[in-house]
């Protein structure tokens, strides 16, 4: 009987910890559709992104397109708040994002810097297809 109580308590604590983690880091599943992040991400890759409290130059992030509500893009952070963007303007609470393959990439070069509020999360790892499973870090 005592062993059951311990097992139940452990399971309850694990459930609470998992719920807290999901709520705090808000994981989301991402399917890569375009080729703008080649060779880092290929069309058909599936990845997991978590809400990011702090960004670093080189992070791969999910952002909402500034002109298309609800349309998300996967890009790389090249300039952070406090930097001077390639267009010569200072970035206060904004980031500059670009695709790894500039050909055909819809990114800050076309729509400018993004408010931090449009950054949805940081891509942590690719989980599909099996031959491409790996963690992603800043480049």
Enumerate the language-model features and the residues they cover.
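Extended hydrophobic leader/signal-anchor segments used for secretion and membrane insertion
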Residues: 1-139
